[in-house]
Regions:
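Active-site metal-binding loops of divalent metal-dependent hydrolases
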Residues: 43-44, 67-68, 97, 119, ...
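Active-site metal-binding motif and surrounding structural segment of the metallo-beta-lactamase
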Residues: 60-61, 71-116, 256-258
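Bacterial Sec-dependent signal peptides at the C-terminal "C-region" and cleavage site
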Residues: 10-26
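Divalent-metal (often Zn2+) His-rich catalytic cores of metallo-beta-lactamase-fold enzymes
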Residues: 244-301
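Metallo-beta-lactamase
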Residues: 25-27, 32, 129-204
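C-terminal regulatory/interaction regions
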Residues: 291-334
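Active-site-proximal loop/helix segments of hydrolase catalytic cores
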Residues: 199-256
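Conserved beta-strand hairpin/beta-sheet module of binuclear metal-dependent hydrolase folds
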Residues: 31-80, 214-226
Length: 334
């Protein structure tokens, strides 16, 4: 029997080697991280998953971490999980409330319990109604803009432009069938889920990517499914974030010697160096903001600066000005 109970501590884990991604579909590829543990990595070439997910064989039950943005992509995730584990999906974890991680919930019920923090469930109820109403009125314009951007993209820009077109196509395709499916189990602080073979620890990370994010730890395997607390080779988005709190939380995960593999919400599976890289990114932006405030530079000028050379190759460059605005606002308050 699966037992769920609150807990606070991490356990010691051992190092697990990386596995190469297995052949996947238009929407995602599957990468085995350890026995019974897989990452489902979004396919950037026009796929509709948009974010990464996880599949865990608990032994007698199957757990999925994050549910993708598009219900059809989520249906494929569900089939893949059940083929790999030979058990139906019993638990789906929502790492946070953003659409690209929760709109696949509907394909897992009935049958699975959807789990999130209390704050995430409440925010999902409010935000999804507002966002879906806006999308139904505006998705046509957004989709056409994405097509135009792809047509005008340079050779270096084209690959990412294909990904963004897939994002808007996935939204457009899903809107007629979308049913907001809220979590039925919520928790605060932390939650263990124990299976006959493997256990996972859900940790609430407050004021990181959003006001409440979930990171899932497999202590014995040394694996962390980070949700959008971690982006790899992509600019994070600080629109809902507290950059300083996020940085401190990332430093905690970096300092945990038991953790060796990190699955980001966006980007490839990575080791600890990716965590430190994102910490450095936040430090760099904070330093730029501090200097701008000291020089009384207007925020409208500050946010127009170019991406630093070391981050030029990262995707999601459209988030950079938003991130500058966020750290500038924080620096002004000091």
């Amino acid at each position: 029997m699966i037992k769920l109970y609150l807990a606070t501590a991490l356990s010691v884990a051992f190092m697990i080697g990386f596995r190469k991604p297995q052949t996947g579909s238009k929407n995602f590829s599957v990468q085995q991280l350890a026995p019974g543990v897989w990452a489902a990595i979004q396919n950037d070439k026009g796929g509709h998953a948009i974010s990464n997910a996880g599949i865990i064989d608990l032994g007698n039950k199957t757990l999925v971490f994050d549910a993708f943005m598009n219900p059809d992509a989520a249906s494929e995730l569900k089939r893949t999980a059940e083929q790999l584990t030979k058990h139906p999906v019993s638990f789906v974890i929502n790492s946070h409330y953003h659409d690209d991680h929760i709109r696949g919930n509907q394909v897992f019920v009935p049958g699975a319990s959807i789990i999130s923090t209390e704050w995430t469930k409440n925010e999902m109820r409010k935000a999804e109604a507002e966002e879906q109403e806006w999308l139904r009125k505006n998705i046509g314009k957004s989709l056409e803009k994405a097509k135009q951007q792809l047509r005008s993209a340079t050779a270096n820009e084209k690959e990412e432009a294909v990904m963004w077109l897939g994002y808007y196509e996935g939204i457009s395709q899903s809107l007629p069938i979308l049913k907001t499916t809220l979590p039925d189990i919520t928790f605060k602080d932390s939650l263990w889920i124990h299976g006959s073979k493997r256990s996972v620890l859900l940790i609430e990370c407050k004021n990181c990517h959003t006001a409440s994010d979930v990171v899932m730890i497999l202590p014995q395997q040394g694996i962390a499914f980070m949700g959008d607390v971690l982006f790899v080779k992509r600019h994070p988005w600080f629109g809902d974030s507290n950059a300083e709190s996020l940085k401190e939380r990332l430093e905690d995960f970096y300092a945990d010697a038991s953790l060796t593999q990190f699955v980001p919400g966006h980007g490839p599976v990575a080791g600890k160096e990716a965590v430190q890289t994102l910490v450095s990114y936040i430090n760099d932006l904070q330093q730029l903001a501090t200097e701008a405030v000291q020089k009384n530079e207007a925020d409208s000028d500050f946010i127009r600066q170019d991406v630093p050379a070391q981050y030029k190759s990262w995707w999601f460059g459209r988030f950079y000005s938003d991130n500058l605005a966020a750290v500038y606002h924080d620096a002004k308050k000091k």
